């Protein structure tokens, strides 16, 4: 399994500039660029395959590649909302798209995965690291659909970045952020 690649980034951030400014009690536009950058930084820390949550926050598209078909083809993000396509390199090294009637999307305690339907079989593939490619959509949807604890964690991170270093509040904010995101962290079973 190769590292996943985001092919379509989210259209928006989970927290808007106006929401962050209201949280920070900032009523001028002088620091909009700074606050926007801090929203992006806080979101990047949480979002996507490399984010601490291992989740897609806003709807986005990813590609996961495998060296071959298997009973379970795990997808590394949650929540997965759709399989857009499954393609493969056939025995002659020609890329083909698999019919949607051959596979299903399921999720268990370990996360989402693609498996073949009963009575179906996987086609033979050419031997290469990217023999099978799954394009999938993941994310909660729009910003308003992101769970509120995650949105609040982003606002607290932005607040911490905006206020600068103050060791007396750092520990409290860090503890609160981790408490807010704990239920959403992808657990390894």
What does each model-identified segment do?
Residues 1-189:
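Divalent metal-cofactor coordination and adjacent catalytic microenvironments
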């Amino acid at each position: 399994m190769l590292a996943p690649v985001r092919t379509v980034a989210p259209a928006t951030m989970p927290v808007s500039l106006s929401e962050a400014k209201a949280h920070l009690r900032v009523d001028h536009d002088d620091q909009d660029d700074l606050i926007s950058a801090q929203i992006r930084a806080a979101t990047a820390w949480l979002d996507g395959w490399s984010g601490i949550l291992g989740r897609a926050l806003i709807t986005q598209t990813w590609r996961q590649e495998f060296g071959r078909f298997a009973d379970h083809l795990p997808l590394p993000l949650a929540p997965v909302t759709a399989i857009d396509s499954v393609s493969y390199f056939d025995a002659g090294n020609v890329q083909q798209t698999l019919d949607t009637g051959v596979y299903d999307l399921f999720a268990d305690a370990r996360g989402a995965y693609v498996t073949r339907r009963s009575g179906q079989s996987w086609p033979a593939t050419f031997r290469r690291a990217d023999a099978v490619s799954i394009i999938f959509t993941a994310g909660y949807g729009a910003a308003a659909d992101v769970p509120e604890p995650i949105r609040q964690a982003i606002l607290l991170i932005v607040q911490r970045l905006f206020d600068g270093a103050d060791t007396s509040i750092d520990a409290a904010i860090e503890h609160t952020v981790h408490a807010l995101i704990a239920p959403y962290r992808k657990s390894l079973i």
